[in-house]
Amino acid sequence: MRPLLCALTGLALLRAAGSLAAAEPFSPPRGDSAQSTACDRHMAVQRRLDVMEEMVEKTVDHLGTEVKGLLGLLEELAWNLPPGPFSPAPDLLGDGF
């Protein structure tokens, strides 16, 4: 069982590096049903993890876009606010003082 786990770990590392993009998918020998069941479960878990990773990446991209949009709105609102008692005096000369 240990060599199988080592082999699967090696394949996972190669897959993560993109080395197996053109290679054929791994198909274990069907001699031992316990090994094939474990391998099938492992492959199912890997597929599910790939789906979850893709969903997380899409969610992060979406949230990043939303945050940028909200920050833009806040900046626009900040420029349109009337000056209050604690607001800095406007820089009429543009010299920063």
Swiss-Prot record:
It comes from the Eukaryota. Transmembrane segments: none annotated. Disulfide bonds: none annotated. Its main location: secreted. One of its GO terms (cellular component) is extracellular region. It is found in: Secreted. The keyword Translocase does not apply. Residues 1-22 form the signal peptide. This is Placenta-specific protein 9. It comes from Homo sapiens (Human).
